[in-house]
Design a protein with these regions (language model features):
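Sec-dependent signal peptide recognition
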Residues: 2-8
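Low-complexity, intrinsically disordered regions enriched in charged/polar residues
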Residues: 5, 138-142, 176
Length: 251
């Protein structure tokens, strides 16, 4: 149950934010990708499972999209929490057209259903809320994770984006921290640690911080995700299975 987080000019620098244009590179993910996770709490105890995968192609208002999915389920004692997120991602323009989220646990119940209209830089939810997006290439909290995988991951680089469809959630700041080797149920993996800071008063009472360890290969699989969840507090998702190319992650 990832709590967000959560991308056209890209911003990068070595020790500070700057703004040269980055030429588009081939996407490191495609339809059919699937990653399974163990969910554990701060003391290492396993409390649940999660899955990220890509379906499609799916048509949204005449545009062929990748359907990005994330599901998780956690349980501590008699308390159970579930989360389901879906994002319809245009792989050509690299933006989101639709986002759905359902979260339910003993503390909260949250449903989000939003359509984004990039050409108008607007969005509309099923409950009637509307808003203006600051960028014509909007993203949501799930598609942002996939977008991060497309960035140059040079340690020390910092990126700043105003691409969350909800203007109040911007800016989103991405910092590439370092390369490191992490243990997983699949063995030790070479990764790049990336931190994502996003405004999220609803879930974090301010800025939220999510840490990703992306595999240091052409697939950039999220091998480890550290965030905060209701019920469990700080939670860590660690990759236990994946179906990527043999040249990625299997070391």
């Amino acid at each position: 149950m990832i709590k967000h987080a959560l991308f056209a000019t890209l911003l990068f620098g070595v020790s500070a934010v700057s703004s040269p244009t980055i030429p588009p590179q081939p996407l490191p993910f495609s339809v059919g990708e699937k990653v399974g996770y163990d969910v554990s709490v701060d003391n290492g105890k396993k409390v649940g499972d999660g899955t990220m995968w890509i379906e499609g192609p799916v048509d949204v208002r005449g545009t062929s999209t990748y359907l990005l999915r994330f599901d998780s389920r956690v349980r501590i004692a008699m308390l159970t929490g579930v989360s389901h997120s879906s994002s319809w991602f245009d792989p050509v323009r690299r933006l989101s057209l639709r986002f759905l989220k359902h979260e339910k646990n003993p503390l909260t119940h949250d449903d989000v259903s939003v359509d984004m209209y990039p050409d108008q830089k607007t969005w509309k939810s099923v409950d009637g809320q509307t808003g203006n997006s600051p960028d014509a290439l909007p993203l949501d909290e799930l598609s942002f994770i996939y977008f991060i995988r497309t960035l140059p991951l040079t340690p020390g680089a910092t990126y700043q984006f105003d691409r969350h469809f909800d203007a109040s959630r911007n800016p989103v700041v991405i910092t590439v921290v370092r390369r490191e080797v992490i243990p997983t149920p699949m063995g030790e993996l070479k990764t790049v640690l990336v931190e994502m800071r996003v405004r999220d008063p609803k879930h974090y009472k301010g800025d939220g911080l999510i840490r990703f360890n992306l595999t240091d290969d052409e697939c950039r699989l999220p091998a480890r995700i550290e965030s905060t969840m209701p019920i469990v507090g700080k939670a860590v998702l660690t990759m236990k299975s994946e179906n990527a190319s043999a040249r990625c992650a299997k070391r």
